[in-house]
Amino acid sequence: MIEKDFVKEGLKRTRIDEYLETKLERAGYGGMDIQVTPVGTMVIVYAEKPGMVIGRGGKTVRAITKTLKNNFDLENPQVEVKEVDVPELNPRIMAHKVVAMLQRGMQFRRVAYSIIRRIMSAGAQGVEVTISGKIRGSRSACAKFNEGYIKKCGEPSIKYVKEGFATVQLKPGVLGIYVRIMPPEVTLPDNIEISEPEIVDVEEPVAQEVPEVQESEIVEEITGEDILEELSEESEIEEITEEIEDVETLEE
């Protein structure tokens, strides 16, 4: 069934992600993306240190490609490595930074505030760091540290907020680190900016003066043909009037 195929592909993607996270922990693994092409399967790996992903002479990336083909049944896998532009805005990288600092014995509050300062200095709108486990005493507890503005629920939280998770084994027990970051380029639906109208100077059209035409300037052209036509019309009228008078005299 189609539903089973979706679940199967999701499990395979999760297994690949966990393998790459374990393999490339020192390289600053920041996530991966899988693209299926007609040629094969493209696996894009995002890392803070791409040189460590490639390895000397491409040794590490060849080993990863071989493992993806044999253990995860990927058809003709091709691994592409991309460097993370701003590691401080990648929650997975920052979660592993918290792990490294806790393993060095630093106090969890100091670690959380240090990471928050780094993330906010990179331009993030908001950040939340959650450390849970045996952080104080023998009982499990949860400590949350946040700064700025970050969405907690709804579609904007799913669509815009980036999340990262990591675990660390310490002497008291296992701690879970959860980092959520609101990137600087996110524009929320309820963020409305009203721009001020532009003031444009419009020049009023200057009315042109129309020269007055005086009666003395209006002159009609009278040609010789017009005079002849008028004379011929007058002679015809006279002839007609004479004929009418003759008829009237005869009737009398």
From Swiss-Prot:
SUPFAM superfamilies: Prokaryotic type KH domain (KH-domain type II), Ribosomal protein S3 C-terminal domain
GO MF assignments: rRNA binding; structural constituent of ribosome
BP GO annotations: translation
SMART domains: KH
Gene Ontology cellular component list: cytosolic small ribosomal subunit
Pfam family, one: Ribosomal_S3_C
InterPro entries (UniProt xref): KH_dom (IPR004087), KH_dom-like_a/b (IPR015946), KH_dom_type_2 (IPR004044), KH_sf_prok-type (IPR009019), Ribosomal_S3_C_sf (IPR036419), Ribosomal_uS3_arc (IPR027488), Ribosomal_uS3_C (IPR001351), Ribosomal_uS3_euk/arc (IPR005703)
Annotated region (Disordered), positions in chain: 233-252
Domain KH type-2: 16-85
Swiss-Prot/TrEMBL keywords: Ribonucleoprotein, Ribosomal protein, RNA-binding, rRNA-binding
Domain of life: Archaea
Function in brief: Binds the lower part of the 30S subunit head.
NCBIfam families in UniProt: PRK04191.1, uS3_euk_arch
HAMAP family: Ribosomal_uS3_A
Subunit note: Part of the 30S ribosomal subunit.
Homology family: Belongs to the universal ribosomal protein uS3 family.
Name used for this protein in its record: Small ribosomal subunit protein uS3
Native source organism of the sequence: Methanosphaera stadtmanae (strain ATCC 43021 / DSM 3091 / JCM 11832 / MCB-3)
Gene: rps3
